[in-house]
Amino acid sequence: MTLLTIKDLTIAYGDAVVVEEVNMTVEEGEVVCLLGANGAGKTTTMSVLAGTLRARSGTVLYSGKDLLRMKLHERVAAGVVLCPEGRKLFPTLSVEENLFLGSFHRKARRSRQQKLKDVFDLFPVLAERRYQYAGNMSGGEQQMLALGRALMANPRLLLLDEPSLGLAPRLVQQVFELIRRISASRISILLVEQNSRAALSVASRGYVLAAGRIVLADTAAGLSDTHRLQRAFFGEVRRDEAELHRA
Protein backbone atom coordinates (compact mmCIF):
# COMPACT_ATOMS: atom_id res chain seq x y z
CA MET A 1 0.00 0.00 0.00
CA THR A 2 1.31 3.45 -0.92
CA LEU A 3 1.68 5.66 2.16
CA LEU A 4 3.13 8.81 0.57
CA THR A 5 2.57 10.09 -2.98
CA ILE A 6 4.33 13.25 -4.14
CA LYS A 7 3.18 14.58 -7.50
CA ASP A 8 4.63 17.56 -9.40
CA LEU A 9 5.92 19.20 -6.21
CA THR A 10 7.43 22.62 -6.88
CA ILE A 11 9.03 24.74 -4.15
CA ALA A 12 10.34 28.30 -4.41
CA TYR A 13 11.97 30.94 -2.25
CA GLY A 14 10.42 34.10 -3.66
CA ASP A 15 10.92 33.96 -7.42
CA ALA A 16 13.69 31.37 -7.20
CA VAL A 17 12.42 27.85 -7.92
CA VAL A 18 14.58 25.39 -5.97
CA VAL A 19 12.58 22.16 -6.42
CA GLU A 20 10.62 21.57 -9.62
CA GLU A 21 7.96 18.97 -10.45
CA VAL A 22 9.25 16.28 -8.10
CA ASN A 23 7.42 12.94 -8.14
CA MET A 24 8.05 10.24 -5.52
CA THR A 25 6.28 7.49 -3.62
CA VAL A 26 6.90 5.67 -0.34
CA GLU A 27 5.15 2.39 0.42
CA GLU A 28 4.04 1.16 3.85
CA GLY A 29 7.03 -0.19 5.78
CA GLU A 30 9.50 0.84 3.07
CA VAL A 31 12.79 2.74 3.30
CA VAL A 32 13.29 5.11 0.37
CA CYS A 33 16.36 7.32 0.06
CA LEU A 34 16.62 10.73 -1.56
CA LEU A 35 20.19 11.31 -2.69
CA GLY A 36 21.95 14.34 -4.11
CA ALA A 37 24.75 16.82 -3.70
CA ASN A 38 24.65 19.88 -1.43
CA GLY A 39 22.09 22.40 -2.64
CA ALA A 40 20.10 19.88 -4.68
CA GLY A 41 16.88 20.58 -2.77
CA LYS A 42 16.73 17.53 -0.50
CA THR A 43 16.28 19.30 2.84
CA THR A 44 13.91 21.81 1.24
CA THR A 45 11.71 18.91 0.12
CA MET A 46 11.76 17.43 3.63
CA SER A 47 10.83 20.82 5.12
CA VAL A 48 7.71 20.96 2.95
CA LEU A 49 6.71 17.43 3.94
CA ALA A 50 7.25 18.22 7.62
CA GLY A 51 5.23 21.44 7.38
CA THR A 52 7.92 24.02 8.12
CA LEU A 53 7.91 25.36 4.55
CA ARG A 54 5.13 25.92 2.01
CA ALA A 55 5.10 24.45 -1.48
CA ARG A 56 4.41 26.63 -4.51
CA SER A 57 2.42 23.90 -6.27
CA GLY A 58 1.90 20.18 -6.50
CA THR A 59 0.13 17.46 -4.54
CA VAL A 60 1.26 15.38 -1.57
CA LEU A 61 -1.02 12.58 -0.40
CA TYR A 62 -0.34 10.87 2.90
CA SER A 63 -2.48 7.80 3.49
CA GLY A 64 -4.87 9.26 0.92
CA LYS A 65 -5.15 12.65 2.67
CA ASP A 66 -3.88 16.01 1.42
CA LEU A 67 -0.74 16.50 3.51
CA LEU A 68 -0.16 20.07 2.32
CA ARG A 69 -3.44 21.18 3.90
CA MET A 70 -2.44 19.84 7.31
CA LYS A 71 -0.86 22.10 9.92
CA LEU A 72 2.50 21.05 11.34
CA HIS A 73 1.08 19.67 14.60
CA GLU A 74 -1.60 17.79 12.65
CA ARG A 75 1.09 16.09 10.56
CA VAL A 76 2.95 14.98 13.67
CA ALA A 77 -0.26 13.66 15.23
CA ALA A 78 -0.94 11.75 11.99
CA GLY A 79 2.50 10.13 12.20
CA VAL A 80 4.64 12.32 9.90
CA VAL A 81 7.73 13.03 11.99
CA LEU A 82 10.95 14.82 11.05
CA CYS A 83 14.36 13.94 12.49
CA PRO A 84 16.15 17.09 11.30
CA GLU A 85 19.56 17.68 9.80
CA GLY A 86 22.04 18.68 12.50
CA ARG A 87 19.99 16.93 15.21
CA LYS A 88 18.57 20.19 16.71
CA LEU A 89 18.71 19.02 20.33
CA PHE A 90 18.36 21.19 23.43
CA PRO A 91 21.89 21.01 24.89
CA THR A 92 21.00 22.22 28.40
CA LEU A 93 18.16 19.72 28.79
CA SER A 94 18.73 16.13 29.86
CA VAL A 95 18.46 13.12 27.58
CA GLU A 96 15.11 12.24 29.13
CA GLU A 97 13.79 15.79 28.78
CA ASN A 98 14.78 15.89 25.10
CA LEU A 99 13.00 12.58 24.55
CA PHE A 100 9.83 13.79 26.25
CA LEU A 101 9.75 16.77 23.88
CA GLY A 102 9.12 14.26 21.11
CA SER A 103 5.84 13.18 22.70
CA PHE A 104 4.13 16.55 23.03
CA HIS A 105 0.95 15.70 21.13
CA ARG A 106 -1.94 14.03 22.91
CA LYS A 107 -1.78 10.64 21.22
CA ALA A 108 1.94 10.23 21.97
CA ARG A 109 1.55 11.44 25.57
CA ARG A 110 -0.82 8.57 26.29
CA SER A 111 1.92 6.02 25.57
CA ARG A 112 4.89 8.12 26.70
CA GLN A 113 6.28 5.71 29.28
CA GLN A 114 5.99 2.69 26.98
CA LYS A 115 7.65 4.61 24.14
CA LEU A 116 10.42 5.69 26.51
CA LYS A 117 11.02 2.05 27.41
CA ASP A 118 11.07 1.11 23.72
CA VAL A 119 13.59 3.86 22.95
CA PHE A 120 15.82 2.81 25.84
CA ASP A 121 15.66 -0.80 24.64
CA LEU A 122 16.76 0.32 21.16
CA PHE A 123 19.39 2.76 22.45
CA PRO A 124 20.75 1.42 25.77
CA VAL A 125 23.29 4.26 25.96
CA LEU A 126 20.41 6.72 26.29
CA ALA A 127 19.07 4.81 29.28
CA GLU A 128 22.52 4.94 30.87
CA ARG A 129 22.70 8.72 30.34
CA ARG A 130 19.07 9.68 30.77
CA TYR A 131 19.89 12.47 33.27
CA GLN A 132 22.96 13.78 31.43
CA TYR A 133 22.83 17.04 29.47
CA ALA A 134 22.45 16.42 25.75
CA GLY A 135 25.19 18.96 25.04
CA ASN A 136 27.74 16.78 26.83
CA MET A 137 27.19 13.76 24.58
CA SER A 138 29.28 12.67 21.60
CA GLY A 139 28.07 13.24 18.04
CA GLY A 140 27.00 9.63 17.65
CA GLU A 141 25.13 9.65 20.95
CA GLN A 142 23.40 12.90 19.99
CA GLN A 143 22.25 11.33 16.72
CA MET A 144 20.81 8.40 18.67
CA LEU A 145 19.02 10.90 20.91
CA ALA A 146 17.60 12.72 17.88
CA LEU A 147 16.34 9.41 16.49
CA GLY A 148 14.91 8.48 19.87
CA ARG A 149 13.10 11.80 20.16
CA ALA A 150 11.52 11.24 16.74
CA LEU A 151 10.41 7.74 17.75
CA MET A 152 8.76 9.15 20.88
CA ALA A 153 6.25 10.83 18.54
CA ASN A 154 5.10 7.37 17.38
CA PRO A 155 5.86 7.93 13.68
CA ARG A 156 4.24 6.12 10.81
CA LEU A 157 6.44 8.00 8.32
CA LEU A 158 9.87 9.04 9.58
CA LEU A 159 11.54 11.85 7.63
CA LEU A 160 15.21 11.30 8.33
CA ASP A 161 17.47 14.16 7.20
CA GLU A 162 21.24 13.57 6.91
CA PRO A 163 21.71 11.22 9.91
CA SER A 164 25.41 10.67 9.09
CA LEU A 165 26.28 14.38 9.08
CA GLY A 166 29.51 15.04 10.99
CA LEU A 167 29.95 11.47 12.19
CA ALA A 168 33.09 9.34 12.01
CA PRO A 169 32.84 6.29 9.67
CA ARG A 170 32.53 3.86 12.59
CA LEU A 171 29.61 5.82 14.01
CA VAL A 172 27.95 6.10 10.59
CA GLN A 173 27.88 2.31 10.39
CA GLN A 174 26.39 2.13 13.88
CA VAL A 175 23.68 4.71 13.14
CA PHE A 176 22.64 2.97 9.92
CA GLU A 177 22.40 -0.35 11.71
CA LEU A 178 19.96 1.35 14.08
CA ILE A 179 18.00 2.71 11.09
CA ARG A 180 17.78 -0.85 9.79
CA ARG A 181 16.35 -1.96 13.15
CA ILE A 182 13.84 0.90 13.14
CA SER A 183 12.64 -0.06 9.66
CA ALA A 184 12.14 -3.64 10.83
CA SER A 185 9.32 -2.33 13.04
CA ARG A 186 7.41 -1.41 9.83
CA ILE A 187 7.95 2.33 10.15
CA SER A 188 8.19 3.87 6.68
CA ILE A 189 11.30 6.00 6.23
CA LEU A 190 12.16 8.71 3.71
CA LEU A 191 15.89 9.13 4.12
CA VAL A 192 17.84 12.15 2.85
CA GLU A 193 21.53 11.40 2.74
CA GLN A 194 24.74 12.41 0.94
CA ASN A 195 26.45 9.16 1.93
CA SER A 196 24.93 7.12 -0.89
CA ARG A 197 26.62 3.86 0.06
CA ALA A 198 25.22 3.95 3.59
CA ALA A 199 21.77 5.03 2.42
CA LEU A 200 21.51 2.33 -0.23
CA SER A 201 22.51 -0.31 2.33
CA VAL A 202 19.21 0.23 4.18
CA ALA A 203 16.86 1.41 1.40
CA SER A 204 14.88 -0.66 -1.09
CA ARG A 205 14.60 2.18 -3.61
CA GLY A 206 15.97 5.63 -4.17
CA TYR A 207 15.75 8.87 -6.08
CA VAL A 208 18.54 11.26 -7.08
CA LEU A 209 17.85 14.98 -6.95
CA ALA A 210 20.06 17.38 -8.94
CA ALA A 211 19.39 21.11 -9.26
CA GLY A 212 15.91 20.60 -7.85
CA ARG A 213 14.80 17.86 -10.25
CA ILE A 214 14.58 14.09 -9.97
CA VAL A 215 17.14 12.87 -12.51
CA LEU A 216 17.26 9.20 -11.58
CA ALA A 217 15.03 6.70 -9.77
CA ASP A 218 15.72 3.00 -9.33
CA THR A 219 16.03 0.14 -6.90
CA ALA A 220 18.88 0.29 -4.40
CA ALA A 221 20.72 -2.33 -6.44
CA GLY A 222 20.29 -0.28 -9.60
CA LEU A 223 21.54 2.88 -7.92
CA SER A 224 24.64 1.07 -6.66
CA ASP A 225 26.19 1.58 -10.12
CA THR A 226 28.79 4.12 -8.99
CA HIS A 227 29.41 5.72 -12.39
CA ARG A 228 25.70 6.13 -13.11
CA LEU A 229 25.11 7.56 -9.63
CA GLN A 230 27.96 10.06 -9.95
CA ARG A 231 26.57 11.27 -13.28
CA ALA A 232 23.16 11.68 -11.67
CA PHE A 233 24.59 13.63 -8.71
CA PHE A 234 25.95 16.21 -11.11
CA GLY A 235 22.83 16.34 -13.27
CA GLU A 236 24.30 14.51 -16.25
CA VAL A 237 21.52 11.91 -16.47
CA ARG A 238 18.60 12.83 -18.69
CA ARG A 239 15.24 13.33 -17.01
CA ASP A 240 13.67 10.65 -19.17
CA GLU A 241 15.85 8.12 -17.34
CA ALA A 242 14.11 9.00 -14.09
CA GLU A 243 11.66 6.13 -14.03
CA LEU A 244 11.27 3.91 -11.00
CA HIS A 245 12.22 0.29 -11.68
CA ARG A 246 10.62 -1.90 -9.06
CA ALA A 247 12.21 -5.17 -8.09
Regions found by a protein language model. Give the residues of each.
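Glycine-rich phosphate-binding loops of nucleotide-dependent enzymes
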Residues: 1-247
